[in-house]
Amino acid sequence: MQRVKTKQIFVGNVAVGGDAPISVQSMTFSKTCDIEATKAQLDRLYFAGADMVRVAVSDPKDADALKDLKKVSPLPLIADIHFRYKFALIAAESVDCIRINPGNIGSKDRIKAVADACNARGIPIRIGVNGGSLEKQFEEKYGATPKGMVESALYNIKLLEDFGFSNIKISLKASDVLRTMEAYRMLRPLVDYPFHLGVTEAGTLPHSMIKSAMALGGLLMEGIGDTMRISITGELEEEIKVARLILQYSGRQKSGVSIVSCPTCGRIEANLVKMVQEVESRIKHIKIPLQVSVMGCAVNALGEAKHADIAIAFGNKDGLIIKEGKILCKLKEDQLLERFITEVEELAKQREEV
C-alpha cells in the first residue's frame, strides 16, 4: 500500500514525513547530566544506525547539561519532558526537538510557553500521547482507549495551532498492539502531521519484537508512519536492529541483507543454526539490498535459490553455492562457508558499483 503523504518537518538535519525515509530513533538510559556516559550511549546508537536520539530531562542538572551534550552528540537530540515545562524552555535553547506528554505537562499557559520557545528556534514538538497517562478529562470520559488517546491528540494539536505553532509530530502509544494500531488508524485521516510510531513499555526483546512487528509492521504496511522507536527492555542496539528489520520486511526500507533460512529437520546434515548465525554476523555490515538463502539440504534449496541473489545449500559433508540462479560451485563443507561469504561480499560490491 502506498505510504500516506504527510507534512514534512526536520529534527536537526533529519527530515521526517513527506517523502523522507522512515527514520529510526532510540532513547538513552543514562542520567543525561552524566555527559560522558550519555555521549557513550549516543555513540553506540550512532554506530548501530539510529537517525536521532531522545534523552530524559528529569531534573535541573539534566536540563543544564543539554547545551554541552548537543555539542558532542553525533545525532539530533530530542528532549523528553514530563511535568516540568520549564525544563522544556531550557531544552529548547539547545536540542533539535521537544517531546511533551499532554497528560502531565500542565496548563494551556505552560504549553504556550513551550510553543513560543520552540517557535523562536524553529524546532518541532512531538505531542506524545500515552495511553497510561491521559489527561483527566479524557481518562474520565473515554478511559484509556484509542478514542481517548485520539481526543487528547486532537485537543493538543488545536492548542498548538491556536498558539501559531504547526511544527508538529504526533505519537499515540499504548502498551498493547490493538489499542496502538486503532489509535493511529483513527487519527490518520484527521490530520496531516507526521506520525512517530511505537508501542510503549513493550517488554524484553522477544515480547517487544512480536508486539512491535505486529503493531508497527501492520501500520507501516498500511502506509502509516514517518519515524519510529522500538521500546525494548534491553540493549540499545537491539532497538535499532529490530526497527530496521521491521522496515525491511514491511517493504518500507530497501536496504540491507534479507536472509532466508530453513527450519531444522531430520534431513539436515550440517550444523545449520551455527552456520546461519555466522553468515548473519559476517554480512550484517552490507547495506546493499540482497536476498541471501541458507538452506540445510537440497529439497528446497534450488527453488529458494531462484528467488535469491545468492544461496548456499548444505549436504552430507559438502554443499552448493548458487549465484543468481546458477550453480557456481560444489565444495567440501570446510571450504563452503568462507567461499560463500566471499561471494556475497563480491556480489554486494558489484551491485554497489552499478
From Swiss-Prot:
Binds 1 [4Fe-4S] cluster. One of its GO terms (molecular function) is 4 iron, 4 sulfur cluster binding. Its cofactor is [4Fe-4S] cluster. InterPro entries: Dihydropteroate_synth-like_sf, IspG_bac, IspG_bac-typ, NO2/SO3_Rdtase_4Fe4S_sf. The gene is ispG. It catalyses: (2E)-4-hydroxy-3-methylbut-2-enyl diphosphate + oxidized [flavodoxin] + H2O + 2 H(+) = 2-C-methyl-D-erythritol 2,4-cyclic diphosphate + reduced [flavodoxin]. This is 4-hydroxy-3-methylbut-2-en-1-yl diphosphate synthase (flavodoxin). [4Fe-4S] cluster binds at residues 262, 265, 297, 304. It comes from Helicobacter hepaticus (strain ATCC 51449 / 3B1).
